[in-house]
Amino acid sequence: MIDPVATVIIVNFNSGDRLAKCLACLEAQTRRDFETIVIDNQSSDGSQAAAQASALPAVLIEAGANLGFAAANNRAAARARGAWLIFLNPDAYAAPDWVEKLLEGAARYPFADAFGSTQIDALDPAKLDGAGDVFHVFGVAYRGGYGRPVEQAPPDGECFAPCAAAAMYRRDRFEALGGFDESFFCYGEDVDLGFRLRLDGGRAVQLAGAKVFHEGSGITGRHSGFTVYHGNRNRIWATYKNMPAEIYWPLAPFRFAVDLYLLVRHSLLGNAAAYLKALRDGYCGLAALRARRRAIQKGRRIGLRELARALTWSPLKVMRRESDLRPVAGDRRAQENPSRATPVPK
């Protein structure tokens, strides 16, 4: 049997009708030399049945428990046969040429180890959901360009990390880095992996032409206590694990100021309890991460200056949620035009 070029992995948990729509979009792809694995985290709504009913051949793995996004993806990746791993959320609906554009990007930028997609808001297609993950030196990560007009989607560029709602990684690199950190459970594990990839000398490219329509926390809730807790606990862990001491310690007062600002913000949104629990568990959990931090920093293959150039320093970019892509070094080809209209999957 000839192995597929890529493996698309979808983690499902009570996604309702979204999984069926997600699979229908994959079935309509212009390039079909990929396999699909759906791993279900013990859904109670029967949504996993869509994997068996779909016209798209899909392998269904019943996890038997809610493993979380990170561990479920790792388990499915261990079953993958493709040289590329493509992670896709069940609330992300791929444009018909999405896989084709991802693999074209891999051919165009053979030095890159990971690729991100242009994420368009599925509920408001005039707006972006994200164009590459940004990591600020104050320990804040966000989807670049979130909420901005879709016409402002950037051309191809080097991103700090791709958003794993719709991203592609070299399987050998993913495995060598140990995959997603399963202690994160959900949220921020893609930024953590991207940070580790960056420290290991890897590079990630955001592809303008690879488009998906993403609901964005459509299953867990954008401002739910679950999202607030895991997102903030995990940003503390990702920063501590990966940020070199020369940057981490001098900027500690600024991270504390960010913590206070976010406390006020989440209090106004009615999520103070979830946020305070995230701070408590985040900082109390740092002791257990010391060995991992030492191993990551000991194995760092890039210089401090190179890392500093990849990080975002401007507070205004965070406040405006601007994308922060770098020109792709050595790219001699014409880049994709991100403003070209793509119909929303029905």
Predicted regions and their residues:
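Conserved donor NDP-sugar-binding/catalytic core segment of glycosyltransferases
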Residues: 92-140
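A short, conserved alpha-helix in the catalytic core of glycosyltransferases
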Residues: 102, 160-211
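Glycine-rich, basic loop-to-helix element that forms the pyrophosphate-binding segment
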Residues: 62-80, 90
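Active-site-adjacent helix/loop segment of glycosyltransferases
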Residues: 200, 204-309
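Short beta-strand/loop segment that forms part of the nucleotide-sugar
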Residues: 34-42, 61-63
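Short, acidic, metal-binding catalytic loop of nucleotide-sugar glycosyltransferases
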Residues: 24-33
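Short aromatic/hydrophobic "clamp" motif used to bind/position activated sugar donors
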Residues: 85
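A recurrent flexible, glycine/aromatic-enriched loop bordering the glycosyltransferase active site
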Residues: 128, 137-141, 148-172, 186, ...
